[in-house]
């Protein structure tokens, strides 16, 4: 959610959003970089959602190095612990010019930004209803393709029996880390979609 918001807040609104920190350290907006307008909005939002997923995947890879050595409840506890650490880091005042500290990030494109209005400002086509379903359908399609791939079959083998999967030559550590990163990627995209729904992002 933070990655999406930081990358899509319009340049003209950054000073008002980051007023406690004298402005934002990030002085660009992806929709503006893509030329603005309807096409710039679509491309900018898609790029921001993908980057949000990538940032989440990179963080998951770093966390997975020590955490994936654990199993069962200990893995869940360690993951929750790292989540709280990351939340505290995002609220750190030193990072305020980037994350806005403990304050909410606002003014970024939301689902209502995709509605088509006439000259009087009245909504003539409410695309905000269909955009989230379209994005979720794309994510589900990618997941289905992944599940039916070679990697997906390896994931299912590990789920059923780790010992048997390792005996078949499947690298458990590599595939567990990959599954952790892939799930975090979609969680990052989901965070961006939640920010668009909630109209703000706050740790």
PLM region descriptions:
Residues 1-203:
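Transmembrane alpha-helices and adjacent helix-loop boundaries
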